[in-house]
A protein has these predicted regions:
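Membrane-embedded helix-loop-helix hairpins and adjacent transmembrane boundary segments
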Residues: 2-680
């Protein structure tokens, strides 16, 4: 029997896919306006208290409660990697990326093991811990690296995600400003950065905390609606049938743990590797831990982490699974669902990037579309504002206060606002730079945190839990770990980018080549020029990065350039030229291996998560050996370890938790274990 609700939903999918004007209607815009007024009221309310000192501006006066802390951790975490990346990962690889989302137990480690220490120290920044435990030098290095990572990768990534989200929701590529067609990217980038920067500059951490309480429930509720409607449509009115269809479409991708021989997600790489990065992110990264430092006391901070751990259980179900549902819908004949163009001529990754917002635009009824769109946009703003504030905190507290130790609290606030404004400006300028670069370069820059996290994780783990760790050992281990991370990053940039650029041109799933076989001469001519530009860029990279093999590569590159024959090609010509290119690539890789040897082997054959694990082992071993060979640390620094609390401090920590806190924490762990058992 036909289900009228399902029929209406399917009709909505088909209509939205063919008619851009139906994405939003008056009800959606009313909801968006209403939510906007709510945000303005929340910002105004949070700014009633004046920021009189650095503690007020950067840590919300250290009076945040558990609801604000937990909501802020969650809202700050839900950024580009979730709204675009996680749903896209679900679309392309199924459950493979769920490991990172099942790290609620690491948030509990933050609350139970690190909160007592951080609370005793009353620090403003994570690098400040390194100075008190080890040396000023280690503080400076970590602070600079963290600021660079925030500004050059995370801020820009959030702005890029905003472009994908808003562009898909509005179905607009350009707008007319003063008689000129302007790419919508610039309107979105400048609008997000300016609006978020404005309230962050004047409100500081307090406004971020207050708005998070409004943002988190709206985003979760709206995302649950997306999951419900997606399964409902896919199952023709039955959620159970929709879930079965999702699992069926995913096939082997439904499993969390893949074979050790899997080229992308071998279990021995992803299980320990994701935990290493997770420990760094949840327990030591300024961007996240700053919310805990703002807590009123240990009890509020710990309970905030417990709430955040519960929240962290949701992204798999409200972001990753909807991506899997979107994939199943694209495989269902007659569904009318599309993720950014003709699936036959659009890469799977590009379709995945638009999966979540396509569900919003095509599955949800009007009204809910507007509400979920608000939740998505303010989640990006919350993530962006947190990054602005964290960067300004690092500059002001780790550098300015060191240069001007007698500066008043009011001066710290002024400097913090100026620093925030400067970071907003630098972030916009950097977006202008990366917009002109080939995307693979930016994607490799995103790996910075993966390659640098092992050294930071070692410093904090041994610094907190091992009394014998010394300052010289920490500095040497940090330097070696950083060099190892940057070395792998350099190998990626020097070797992989040119190879992958050229190889990507031959990928039959990528839209560039597939457009050539669509039969449109005009489109083919345009795409041919884009491919020509790509190959010329890759050729230039090869020549500059590999001067020793320039002559040897000339023949291979010439073969690759044969693909540029004419303004349009037939499918047979396409296949012929594709065969030529694919035949040239093995010889190209062989030549590179002969010239670059070990570096090329490392880049090509060692999974980046294996490299992360190996770097952790090397860094930890080095720090332990040097610590044992150098003078024992000053007893004054040992008090900044997990075991350095006085009897009074231990009693205060014990009084800050009760049986309910333990039970709730165990529930989080139990859910994670059951999830792994179910999807093993």
């Amino acid at each position: 029997m036909d289900n009228p609700v399902t029929n209406a939903a399917v009709s909505t999918v088909a209509d939205a896919a063919t008619n851009a004007g139906t994405v939003f209607n008056g009800l959606d815009w009313f909801v968006i306006a209403l939510f906007g007024l709510g945000m303005i009221a929340t910002v105004w309310y949070s700014m009633r208290k004046k920021n009189e000192s650095g503690k007020d501006y950067f840590l919300s006066g250290r009076d945040a409660n558990w609801l604000q802390i937990g909501s802020s951790i969650y809202s700050s975490n839900i950024g580009s990697e979730h709204l675009v990346g996680l749903a896209g990962a679900g679309f392309v690889t199924g459950m493979a990326m769920a490991h990172w989302e099942m790290h609620g137990w690491l948030i509990l480690v933050l609350g139970w093991a690190f909160v007592p220490l951080y609370d005793r120290m009353k620090i403003f920044t994570m690098p400040e811990f390194l100075e008190l435990r080890f040396s000023r030098g280690s503080r400076n290095v970590l602070s600079l690296l963290t600021m660079a990572s925030l500004v050059l990768t995370k801020i820009a990534a959030t702005i890029y995600a905003g472009d994908v989200v808003i562009r898909t929701l509005l179905n607009v590529d350009s707008v007319n400003l003063l008689g000129h067609n302007v790419d919508i990217f610039w309107v979105i980038a400048l609008g997000l950065a300016f609006t978020t920067g404005l309230y962050t500059i004047f409100g500081g951490m307090r406004v971020i905390m207050y708005t998070a309480v409004l943002q988190a429930p709206v985003l979760i509720f709206g995302s649950v609606c997306i999951l419900y409607m997606g399964l409902h449509v896919l199952g023709h009115g039955s959620l159970a049938d929709g879930w079965k269809a999702t699992l069926s479409a995913a096939g082997k991708n439904v499993h969390l743990v893949r074979s050790i021989h899997d080229p992308d997600w071998p279990w021995l790489a992803i299980l320990p590797g994701s935990a290493i990065i997770g420990f760094w992110y949840w327990c030591t990264d300024q961007y996240i831990v700053q919310r805990v430092l703002a807590g009123k006391n240990q009890q509020e901070s710990r309970r905030g982490t417990i709430l955040a751990a519960f929240f962290k259980l949701t992204p798999v179900f409200i972001f990753l699974v909807p991506g899997m549902v979107a994939f199943a819908l694209t495989q269902t004949p007659g569904s009318g669902f599309t993720t950014g163009g003709d699936a036959a001529y659009t890469s799977l990754v590009a379709q995945g990037d638009a999966a979540y917002t396509s569900l919003v635009a095509q599955i949800l009824p009007h009204g809910l579309r507007g509400m979920v769109a608000c939740g998505m946009i303010v989640a990006l703003m919350a993530s962006l504002g947190s990054k602005f504030n964290a960067s300004a905190t690092l500059f002001t507290m780790d550098f300015y206060r060191e240069w001007h130790p007698t500066a008043s609290g009011r001066t710290e606030v002024i400097v913090g606002r100026i620093a925030t404004a400067a970071i907003v400006f630098i972030g916009i300028c950097w977006v202008l730079v990366i917009k002109s670069l080939h995307m693979p370069l930016y994607e490799y820059l995103q790996n910075v945190q993966g390659y640098l996290s092992p050294a930071i994780a070692v410093l904090f783990a041994l610094g907190v839990f091992w009394k014998r760790a010394t300052a010289p050992a920490a500095l040497w281990a940090f330097v070696v770990g950083m060099l190892g991370g940057f070395g792998r990053l350099a190998a990626d940039l020097i070797i992989a980018r040119p190879i992958n650029t050229l190889k990507g041109i031959t990928d039959g799933n990528l839209s560039m080549l597939n457009y050539l076989v669509k039969g449109s001469v005009n489109v083919a001519a345009e795409k041919t020029q884009q491919i020509k530009d790509q190959i010329q860029e890759a050729t230039s990279q090869m020549a500059s990065a590999l001067p020793l093999v320039k002559d040897q590569l000339a023949i291979k590159i010439q073969c690759l350039q044969q693909i540029l024959g004419g303004t349009g090609i037939t499918p047979d010509q396409y296949n012929e030229k594709k065969t030529i290119v694919e035949a040239a690539l093995p010889a190209l890789k062989t030549q590179l291996h002969e010239q670059w040897g070990l570096i090329f082997s490392f880049q090509q054959n060692i999974h980046w998560l294996y490299y992360c694990e190996g770097l952790l082992v090397v860094t930890a071993a080095l720090m332990i050996i040097i610590s044992l060979l150098t003078r024992a640390p000053d007893p004054k620094t040992v008090k900044y370890t997990y075991y350095g609390a006085t009897p009074e401090e231990k009693a205060a920590t014990r009084a800050s938790w009760n049986a309910m806190d333990v039970v709730l924490s165990l529930i989080v762990v139990a859910v994670i274990v059951l999830f792994y058992i179910k999807f093993w």
